[in-house]
Swiss-Prot record:
It is found in: Cytoplasm. SMART domains: RRM. GO terms for molecular function: identical protein binding; RNA binding; translation initiation factor activity; translation initiation factor binding. Belongs to the eIF-3 subunit B family. The gene is prt1. This is Eukaryotic translation initiation factor 3 subunit B. Residues 1-10 have a biased composition (Polar residues). GO terms for biological process: formation of cytoplasmic translation initiation complex; spore germination; translational initiation. Keywords: Cytoplasm, Initiation factor, Protein biosynthesis, Repeat, RNA-binding, WD repeat. CDD domains: RRM_eIF3B. WD repeats lie at residues 193-230, 232-289, 301-342, 454-494, 511-554, 569-607. Component of the eukaryotic translation initiation factor 3 (eIF-3) complex. GO terms for cellular component: cytoplasmic stress granule; eukaryotic 43S preinitiation complex; eukaryotic 48S preinitiation complex; eukaryotic translation initiation factor 3 complex; eukaryotic translation initiation factor 3 complex, eIF3e; eukaryotic translation initiation factor 3 complex, eIF3m; multi-eIF complex. Residues 1-20, 693-720 are annotated as: Disordered.
Length: 738
């Protein structure tokens, strides 16, 4: 029976304390989080120290900066005073939302207020989080400065004396980087097991090789491919570089869960799917929730396919934009990642958009601009619409209305001269489909639109010539029988010859009764491979020349093209085709990611000659290393083309010399092996002679008859074992290749 209160002893009173009951689970469950309600506050340090009568004036001046990243007011700024009625050099500011407070920290921290003062902006809760007891040492300890180590040259491969190109090869669990040696075996640069868990990807200028892991993305570079930068993003699945390699976008289907004390990620990234990184600093600029994963799913509205790239970059990296399908396009300014004009561009029904891949100077337009093209479907009685928008003004500079639209695809020419709008139209009964092309001539005054409506079937693939004004498309009519690949037609288009500007686009030739479904232009233009990929029955690669130097057909004389099929080759199970950055070589690959039959890659010349076949077990990925843009001016490039025949003679001599060196290497190897054999034979004979002397055998003891008749030495005590060695030289030859 428990004692009554009156009978409790001193020991009984403290008995419960001694048991030390653990309440940590209850504390964790009911603890009041200080972040709640305070995540909209920031602390601004580095302000001028002013008397009370100047405080309001300083606050108004400060608000000019504060309102560039969000919304706040004079009442939401608290600037404390000391006993002398002087400000303390800091202030507390409340924003309307936590997102605005985060933007203030990222965009205003370290910015100058005037010539003498620099703003230092921190979240109020960061001061509590990092400044609480035990987090900061009472005594100052100087930081440990590591000794200077010179970094590797990140573009060293461009200095190869033979101007060779590199490629990355992913097979099995190994990734290697190799030099291309034409028909000779590739030369290994580095080869590592478990270098990546998902895939590898070159940056657009070839500076970095990215490997993807469950922990994040790792960039490698330099002659030895050492570690350059790390971007922690748990369970990252997709990555995208900006055109100039300044920024990196990473995406994961799983929202990020940030652990306390993480060296890079903060609670601002918690729960996000997308991070935009600064490659130079290795720090996140801003993080976002994926539109496709936001909100609850229902049976009526199934989960949409992930839009990738989620962010699309302008040609000069000054802007990056993302689309909320059907509603708006949000354009952000770099490097601050603030929303342009503080608002998204509201576009009802917007389905897709694309930036111009180059900065365009339109006729009659002097101010700086980047161009963006988007389209909207038919909504009610309103027609579908394609529009060109100028950024940063957000002005619509050209629109085009479309009717009976099923789908639209936007295709920019690499220099931004044209944008082709591929419009799939249905008949009024919606039983048949056809395609026409609306080509915007962007650089011409008023942006005129040319319509190509001579196509009777649906276009399934379209591709502009790089740095040119020609294009290739593939059409298909009615579907073929079960199991049979659809019959397609390949059409080549070129402009008419009309002065400096490209004339109207005309059909050069159509190749019927094909199964082709993919188009791969040389990065230098002129040559194009039209292929059948991901097929179970057809594997043809057609190598075409658009500027054949032979005789021209009469009906093509007025067009800026002379079409010629150079060669057709087959590659069983082909899934991917990759041009090298110089346009000299083409690699066709059969990836194990698609099928397990005869995986490997073949190397071809631009004209279709197969230089090497490389069957490779568990082959997954082949990627040529990109090259940065040339540093030569247009005039210097023109001079190089003019003297190309002279250079080609030098190249032919170098190729011949390389072949001679290869033959010489073979001869030297054979001589070395022969000399090693002769030396070994001499050494063995010397050992044999020593053994004969040790056992008192005659010189002819190695002959069968002499060994049998040899006298026995009875002076030795015990038994003597004589080993008979029989050596026969079957054949000995010496071959020397000149």
């Amino acid at each position: 029976m428990a004692p009554s209160f009156e009978n409790l002893s001193e020991q009984d009173l403290h008995e419960e304390e001694e048991e030390e009951i653990d309440f940590s689970d209850l504390k964790a469950q009911y603890e009041v989080k200080l972040e709640e309600g305070l995540d909209t506050f920031v602390v601004i340090d580095g302000l001028p120290v002013v008397p009370e009568e100047n405080r309001q004036k300083l606050i108004k001046f400060l608000l000019r900066k504060l309102n560039t990243v969000g919304h706040t007011s004079e009442d939401a700024v608290f600037m404390p005073l000391n006993e002398k009625n002087m400000s303390e050099g800091f202030a507390f500011v409340e924003y309307e939302t936590a997102e605005q407070a985060v933007a203030a920290v990222k965009q205003l921290h370290g910015t100058p207020l005037d010539k003498k003062h620099t703003l230092l902006v921190n979240k109020l809760m960061d001061i509590e989080r990092y400044g609480r007891e035990g987090r900061i040492d009472e005594e100052y300890k100087p930081p440990n400065i590591e000794p200077f180590t010179e970094k590797e040259h990140l573009r060293s491969w461009l200095g190869d004396p033979n101007a060779r190109d590199q490629f990355a090869l992913y097979r099995g669990d190994k990734v290697g980087v190799f030099w291309n040696n034409k028909s000779n075996p590739p030369e290994n640069v580095v080869d590592r097991a478990h270098w990546t868990q998902l895939f590898v990807q070159w940056s657009p200028k070839g500076t970095y090789l990215a490997s993807v892991h469950p922990q994040g993305v790792q960039l490698w570079g330099g002659p030895t491919f050492s570690k350059q930068k790390q971007f922690p993003h748990p369970f990252v699945s997709l990555i995208e570089f900006s055109p100039g390699e300044s920024y990196l976008t990473t995406w994961s289907a799983r929202p990020i869960q940030v652990e306390e004390g993480h060296p890079v990620l903060t609670y601002e990234e918690d729960g996000k799917n997308i991070i935009v990184w600064d490659i130079v600093t290795g720090k996140p600029l801003r993080s976002f929730v994926s539109h496709d994963l936001a909100g609850p799913e229902s049976e009526a509205q199934p989960k949409k396919k992930v839009q990738w790239p989620a962010f699309k970059w302008s040609a000069d990296e000054k802007y990056v934009a993302r689309m909320l399908q059907g509603q708006s396009i949000s354009i952000y300014e770099l490097p601050r990642m603030n929303l342009l004009g503080k608002t998204s561009v509201k576009i009802d029904g917007v389905m897709d958009f694309e930036w111009s891949p180059a900065t365009v100077n339109r006729d009659g337009v002097k101010q700086y601009e980047q161009l963006l093209c988007f389209w909207t479907p038919e909504i009610g009685s309103n027609p579908a619409r394609v529009a060109l928008m100028s950024v940063p003004s957000k002005e619509i500079v050209r629109t085009r209305n479309l009717f009976n639209v099923s789908d639209v695809k936007l295709h920019w020419q690499s220099q931004g001269n044209f944008v082709c709008v591929k419009v799939d139209r249905h008949s009024k009964s919606k039983k048949s489909m056809a395609t026409n092309l609306e080509i915007f001539r962007v650089r011409e005054k008023g942006v005129p639109v040319e319509v190509v409506d001579s196509l009777k079937d649906t276009v399934i693939n379209f591709s502009w010539e790089p740095n040119g004004a020609r294009f290739v498309l593939i059409t298909t009519g009615d579907a073929s029988g079960a199991g049979a690949p659809p019959k397609t037609a390949v059409s080549f288009f070129a402009p008419e010859k009309k002065g400096v500007q490209a004339g109207n686009f005309k059909l050069v030739r159509t190749i019927e009764k094909k199964t082709s479904n993919a188009i791969y232009w040389s990065p230098k233009g002129r040559f194009v491979v039209v292929a059948t990929v991901h097929s179970q029955s057809n594997f043809d690669l057609d190598f075409w020349d658009m500027d054949f130097e032979g005789e021209k057909n009469d009906n093509e004389k007025d067009l800026a093209a002379n079409l010629q099929l150079m060669k057709t080759v087959d590659h069983y199970g082909v899934t991917d085709i990759e041009w090298d950055p110089t346009g000299r070589y083409v690699v066709s690959g059969a990836s194990a990611w698609t099928h397990q039959m005869e995986n490997g890659f073949n190397l071809h010349t631009f004209s279709g000659e197969t230089l090497a076949e490389n069957p490779t077990d568990k082959f997954k990925q082949f990627l040529w290393r990109p090259r940065p843009p040339t540093l030569l001016s247009k005039e210097e490039q023109k001079q190089v083309r003019k003297n190309l025949r002279e250079y080609s003679k030098e190249f032919e001599e170098e190729d011949k010399y390389a072949v001679d060196i290869a033959n010489t290497a073979v001869v030297e190897k054979r001589k070395r092996v022969l000399n090693e054999w002769v030396a070994w034979l001499k050494r063995e004979k010397e050992l044999l002679t020593e053994e004969k002397e040790a056992y008192g055998l005659p010189e002819e003891a190695d002959q069968p008859k002499a060994a049998k008749d040899a006298p026995t030495n009875t002076e030795d005590k015990g038994e003597t074992v004589v080993e008979e060695i029989v050596e026969e030289i079957v054949e000995e030859s010496e071959e020397i290749i000149g």
